[in-house]
Every structure is written in C-alpha cells, then in structure tokens.
C-alpha cells in the first residue's frame, strides 16, 4: 500500500534512523545530511532534462554529464567530466531562491544559478564529444504544479535511505548551439524537469527510469517509472502528471531488452492500468543513446495507454517523446 504523506517530516530521527516512509505531492521531507548517522558516504545527484519537438538536453551535475539529441535529424552528441561536486558547498535546493554552482577547466565552463523564479544554466564546452563546441544559455521558469517526493529507508538498517524529488514544473527559454547548429527554446513549447536525489546505501544498484515530458492534446504530460531502491512498499517513484497534477502508480512490471538497446521496452501494471511500449530511436541500426561514465540515456517514443478509474477515458500515448536513463550508483 502506497502511503501519502501530507505534513512536513524530518528525514532523520535523533538516532539517525529514517522512520518515515512514503511519498508526497510537495517537498515535505526536510533533509539535513549532518543529522545522518551512517558510516558510509552521502551521495548527491542533480539532473536536468530540457526538451521540445526538435532537441533534448540532458545535464547531470554529480559528475558533469551532458548529452544533446537532435530529434528531427537523428543523432546525439555527449561528453562527461568525472568531477564529483559537494552540494553542501554549492547548494541548489528545489525550493531555494539563491545559490550558484560554478565549474571551470580547460575545456568547460558551467554555471548553474538559482533565481527567485527558477534556474539559469550557461555552458561553454570546447570540443564537446570530441566533435564540436557546445554552448547553451537557458532560463528555466518555474510553473504551478505538484512534484513527486519519495523517502525510502532500507529494511535491515534504517540509517540508510533513498530520497527523491522529481519536479516536472519548469519551462525553458534560450538557445543551444552545437557547432554550426542552433536550437531555439521557447517557453511555450519547451519543457524541463529537475530530478533531485540524495542517498546513502549499503550496496550498489543498477537503476532504470523511464521518463517523458511533452504535450498530449495540448496538455503537459510528464512520466516517471523507476526501478526499486530501498524499501519502497510505502512509496515509489512511479507516477505521471497531467497539467501539473500528480497521479500515483504502484508497482510496474518491466520487460526489458536483455541488453539490446535498440529493442522495445514493455511496461505493464494492473488490469491494463499501464500498458505502454518504449521504442528507441535508431540511427543506422543503432539505438540513439548517450554513454556517459556509468550512465546511459536512450532517446525514443512511447505508445500505449494509461487508465485510471477516475479518468473519463484512457490517456493515449502515440509517438510521445520519452527517454530511459540507465545508471549504476
């Protein structure tokens, strides 16, 4: 049974254990890593995904992982700088209105700034992917809507935990330039989500997440279907959003491709409550994917239906933009 939490809770008790477990529509889980009592390290992962019908930009700032996919012409360019950030020194909280993260080396200059209204992202990357120079200058504006917030302790030792926020409530304006190709981002047609994760775990996990952030029949649609981390009986990451309203889903059955990234993935739950197929884009017979350190992002489309008893009719996914993130952490 999924447990919805509506009031604010500290993530850690006085003894460092995580006793609350569940999910929420707002960021009610108050996190302070200094209250943790685990012997292992705390990991921090922030990811942005910006997309319209022409281009998608993936940006992860745990290590610097950047991928730009051309959705009309086909093809993806990507690069990675293995440089872990300490977010306690460069805090970008989901609800904050200040804070800045800066990184500079011989090839890359990256700036991420919190603003009262959202985020400002700027990047100059020389010889991006060993092919072309990359430049982007993007303003993310926060819009109204709910977010998915999940806290999952680990059963055998509740001092270990997994805390997630999936925030699909930004629109983007600005430009992305890769070599001589320039993509314009307009707030009316370009969506962005923010994926925020904090955790301390006793072992490594192979993690997968299917996400979408597009328009269906003029309404914004966002999706998050993810594999299990920790004890998520009371709260998992599985959900979708229509025009900012969160619809929670329970366990999802996934039939993957056995490592063949160009093959379809199948996602099912309940009595056809979830029945969707993810089909990767292919270029010259290969999946359109970015390979960055221990993370792979596959770009593709969704087909199928989502059904709920409180919906007048099924939500039909037909050639809807989507992507799968595969990573080890």
PLM feature segments, named:
Residues 1-329:
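Structured soluble/peripheral alpha/beta segments that form catalytic or ligand/cofactor-binding pockets
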């Amino acid at each position: 049974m999924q447990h919805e939490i509506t009031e604010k809770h500290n993530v850690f008790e006085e003894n460092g254990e995580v006793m609350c477990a569940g999910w929420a529509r707002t960021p009610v889980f108050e996190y302070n890593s200094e209250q943790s009592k685990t012997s292992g390290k705390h990991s921090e992962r922030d990811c942005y995904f910006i997309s319209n019908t022409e281009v998608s930009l993936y940006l992860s700032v745990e290590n610097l992982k950047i991928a730009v996919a051309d959705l009309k012409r086909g093809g993806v360019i990507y690069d990675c700088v293995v440089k872990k950030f300490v977010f306690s020194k460069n805090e970008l909280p989901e609800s904050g209105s200040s804070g800045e993260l800066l990184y500079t080396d011989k090839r890359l200059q990256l700036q991420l700034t919190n603003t009262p209204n959202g985020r400002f992202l700027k990047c100059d990357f020389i010889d991006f992917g060993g092919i072309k120079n990359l430049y982007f200058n993007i303003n993310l504006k926060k819009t109204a809507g709910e977010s998915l917030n999940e806290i999952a302790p680990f059963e055998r030792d509740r001092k270990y935990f997994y805390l997630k926020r999936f925030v699909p409530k930004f629109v983007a304006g600005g430009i992305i330039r890769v070599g001589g190709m320039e993509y314009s981002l307009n707030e009316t047609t370009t969506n962005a989500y923010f994926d925020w994760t904090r955790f301390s775990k006793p072992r490594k996990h192979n993690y997968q997440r299917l996400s979408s952030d597009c328009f269906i029949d003029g309404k914004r649609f966002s999706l998050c279907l993810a594999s299990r981390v920790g004890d998520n009986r009371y709260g998992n990451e599985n959900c979708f959003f229509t025009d900012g309203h969160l619809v929670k889903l329970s366990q999802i059955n996934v039939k993957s491709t056995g490592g063949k990234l160009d093959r379809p993935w199948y996602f099912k739950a309940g009595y056809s409550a979830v029945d969707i197929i993810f089909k990767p884009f292919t270029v010259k017979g290969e999946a359109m994917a970015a390979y960055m350190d221990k993370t792979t992002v596959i770009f593709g489309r969704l087909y199928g239906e989502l059904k709920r008893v409180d919906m007048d009719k099924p939500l039909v996914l037909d050639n809807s933009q989507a992507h799968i993130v595969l990573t080890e952490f």
